């Protein structure tokens, strides 16, 4: 969970709280956090814990997601792909701070494609887009990947490919 060296940021501790400075010693983020950790393998994304609530900052101290969640995890392999957030329910927040999916789902998988996400709601898996349209409701047990209009699904222990329209 080391901070990336090439990001020119250092973790500092003052009076039992953590913050960030750059290599010149300039403060990037005040020492007011219980902890600051990286998202494993994701650059420019630091999880902050403030009084038991998690948030996310970039490597120059800009707040991307305020400290108001129980859990935050990356959606994909790059920070630009967004983050899954959780309190009582799950949702998705984009890097630009916009809400991609309202936090109303029982689960959001770390699989998405072409603006669509795999979610569980009321015990059933489905695919939704950012405008709230639902696809393939109750048509699968699991989704392995989404590639444009094609979805690799698992149903009754068997794998197959469906289009987003159900063909």
Spans of features found by a protein language model:
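Residue-level detector of conserved, function-critical positions
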Residues: 1-167
């Amino acid at each position: 969970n080391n901070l990336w060296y090439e990001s020119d940021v250092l973790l500092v501790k003052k009076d039992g709280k953590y913050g960030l400075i750059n290599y010149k010693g300039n403060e990037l983020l005040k020492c007011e956090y219980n902890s600051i950790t990286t998202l494993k393998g994701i650059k420019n994304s630091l999880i902050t814990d403030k009084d038991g609530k998690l948030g996310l900052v970039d490597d120059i101290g800009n707040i991307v997601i305020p400290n108001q969640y129980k859990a935050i995890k990356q959606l994909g392999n790059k920070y630009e792909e967004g983050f899954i957030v959780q309190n009582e329910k799950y949702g998705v927040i984009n890097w630009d701070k916009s809400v991609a999916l309202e936090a109303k789902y029982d689960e959001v998988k770390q699989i998405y494609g072409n603006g669509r996400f795999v979610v569980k709601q009321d015990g059933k898996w489905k695919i939704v887009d950012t405008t709230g349209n639902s696809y393939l409701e109750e048509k699968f047990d699991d989704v392995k990947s989404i590639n444009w209009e094609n979805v690799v699904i698992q149903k009754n222990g068997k794998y197959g490919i469906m289009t987003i329209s159900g063909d």
